[in-house]
Amino acid sequence: MSSSNLGNVVCVTGASGYIASWLVRLLLHRGYTVKATVRDPNDPKKVDHLVKLDGAKERLQLFKANLLEEGAFDSVVQGCHGVFHTASPFYHDVKDPQAELIDPALKGTLNVLNSCAKSPSLKRVVLTSSIAAVAYNGKPRTPDVVVDETWFTDADFCAKSNLWYVVSKTLAEEAAWKFVKENNIDMVTINPAMVIGPLLQPVLNTSAAAILNLINGAQTFPNASFGWVNVKDVANAHILAYENASASGRHCLVERVAHYSEVVRILRELYPSLQLPEKCADDKPYVPIYQVSKEKAKSLGLEYTPLEVSIKETVESLKEKKFANL
């Protein structure tokens, strides 16, 4: 444990989530005192894995906070030097996108930032955004194209295609930048792509489910290319962006862009006996891969875990947590 951060108090919202759980673990390991918010501190599925973390007994405090309840974060944020706002829903099957995704992302972010504006101790906010807020603007993404932090997703363009998660992250990040400019808050954003790697929480999350589907008997793999990144690298990037005084703006996090066919190929090499999908879900040409700039991530001092290792860690974790019966 690093002793240099003792007395350094930070808040993590949505602490029971996939990225946030790792963030809490790494912050505790580095000596921080963590004030963590969850929707229900009495739900063992939300908090048991957090209270068992090394250092939790001494330096982790849990608070109940609802994203949509005005002022719910005021008392938690008071006295904090840093706030990591990770809380935002991520799932695809939505009936009411406004209520299920957009309101919690947008209003929730502004609610947390509003509390930050009232806290004189606050030095910096790190916002968990997404590559979803960067790369979806109708511009072609082909192998010679490099997506970087100057790209902004076009929310209207995405709403027409019912990409509601993408819309929610885009509107939330746009509103956050506007708010922090007006209120003179120092904020940086972390914009990861598809996050995989080991699970600390007992509940299956959306991005790990993408790997689970491939190893649990799917007949086909999706015709899609995504950026992939390890959850531990994402959590680490949040802390580096907080600690590194010169960090600013947005930080895309992608170790590699790979088509699902490539992910299946890696799985086949790692686990030759697995029943894996042989064919693509459609007969169209494969959606091309593209590049994502690593410059901003490098400026934080971040080193990436290779995709092969991340995939293996994900499968081993899914086995250990009994999601996959291999």
From Swiss-Prot:
Family membership, please give it.
Answer: Belongs to the NAD(P)-dependent epimerase/dehydratase family. Dihydroflavonol-4-reductase subfamily.
Provide the residue positions that the database annotates as binding (E)-coniferaldehyde.
S130, Y136, R141, Y165, M194, S207, F226, V257, Y290
Listed A to Z, the keywords are: Cytoplasm, NADP, Oxidoreductase
**Catalytic activity, EC:** 1.2.1.44
The answer to keyword Glycoprotein applying to this record is: no
Outcome after substituting S130A:
Impaired activity
Could you tell me which pathway this protein works in? Aromatic compound metabolism; phenylpropanoid biosynthesis
Is this entry keyworded Cytoplasm? yes
Name of the protein described by the UniProt record: Cinnamoyl-CoA reductase CAD2
Purpose of the protein: Involved in lignin biosynthesis. Regulates the monolignol composition by catalyzing the conversion of cinnamoyl-CoAs into their corresponding cinnamaldehydes. Can use coumaraldehyde and coniferaldehyde as substrates, but barely sinapaldehyde.
- Gene symbol of the encoding locus: CAD2
Q: What positions constitute the catalytic site? A: K169
Question: Care to name a GO molecular-function term for this sequence?
Answer: cinnamyl-alcohol dehydrogenase activity
- Compartments where located: Cytoplasm
Task: Provide the catalytic activity annotation.
Answer: (E)-cinnamaldehyde + NADP(+) + CoA = (E)-cinnamoyl-CoA + NADPH + H(+); (E)-coniferaldehyde + NADP(+) + CoA = (E)-feruloyl-CoA + NADPH + H(+); (E)-4-coumaraldehyde + NADP(+) + CoA = (E)-4-coumaroyl-CoA + NADPH + H(+)
A GO CC annotation given for this chain: cytoplasm
Q: Which residues bind NADP(+)?
A: 14-20, 39, 46, 66-67, 86-88, 165, 169, 192-195, 207
